[in-house]
Design a protein with these regions (language model features):
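Metal-dependent phosphoesterase signature
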Residues: 44-85
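Active-site neighborhood of HAD-like aspartate-dependent phosphohydrolases
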Residues: 1-61
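Substrate-recognition "cap/lid" segment bordering the active-site pocket of phosphatases
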Residues: 101-151, 155-159
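Short catalytic/ligand-binding loop motif for oxyanion handling, primarily in non-cytosolic enzymes
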Residues: 14-17, 21-22, 105-109, 133, ...
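Acidic, Mg2+-coordinating phosphoryl-transfer loop and its flanking beta/alpha structural elements
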Residues: 147-188
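Substrate-recognition element of Asp-dependent hydrolases with the DxDx(T/V) motif
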Residues: 74-79, 83-113, 125-127
Length: 202
């Protein structure tokens, strides 16, 4: 029986941070560069609002408006490089599930996006949403689902996994990843994730 790996969606599979930047530029009329959306911070929640305030556009942008647009159409959100290829490779050795803390109202649009970008029928689960404060933590959900490892960009979720006896990979290089998570592995991109798992099996 294959071991189960849980994978986050936003900024792990889907380039949501980049979609947010481009949306913000379009709405505000201010051309912020990718590096301006990668600001060191110890707090994930409120990250975008702090960036907008720093550049004086907080009165023109609202995360809830961006999220509302995603309910019906997520086509502007790109697939991160090598995500589909590496996940397909991992599926040969592991049972892959997706665990997201997205607002549940995004479920239908999320399923459409996943079907367009990933191969196979991968189970999708919704964990606690930080803005709504409802549901189980990712660590609790991963433990309940029998996942031995979580791949996530959010250090809080990785800490939650470890607290529940689930291994964690902190994915990507984002400004909100300043906090240290003891016992977590850091992988900057999907090729690094594949390299890590290849090394585990040797």
């Amino acid at each position: 029986m294959k071991q189960t790996i849980a994978i986050d969606i936003d900024d792990v599979i889907a380039g949501t941070n980049e979609a947010m930047r481009l949306w913000g530029n379009r709405i505000s009329g201010v051309e912020l560069k990718p590096e301006q959306y990668n600001v060191p911070s110890n707090d994930y929640w409120g990250y975008y609002e702090r960036i907008w305030a720093e550049h004086g556009v907080e009165d023109r942008l609202d995360f809830d408006v961006f999220e509302t647009e995603l309910i019906q159409d997520q086509s502007q959100v790109p697939l991160l490089a090598s995500a589909s290829l590496v996940i397909e490779e991992l599926q040969k050795r592991f049972h892959i599930i997706l665990v997201t803390s997205r607002n549940p109202v995004l479920e239908a649009g999320t399923r459409v996006w996943l079907k367009e970008h990933l191969t196979g029928d991968i189970d999708l689960y919704f964990a606690k949403n930080g803005r709504m404060n409802i549901g189980r933590s990712k660590g609790e959900l991963c433990k309940e689902l029998g996942a031995f490892l979580l791949i996530d960009d959010n250090v809080d979720h990785c800490q939650s996994a470890i607290d529940n006896g689930v291994e964690a990979i902190i994915f990507g290089e984002y400004g909100w990843q300043n906090a240290v998570v003891e016992g977590a592995v850091k992988c900057r991109d999907w090729p690094a994730v594949l390299e890590y798992f290849n090394g585990r099996t040797k």
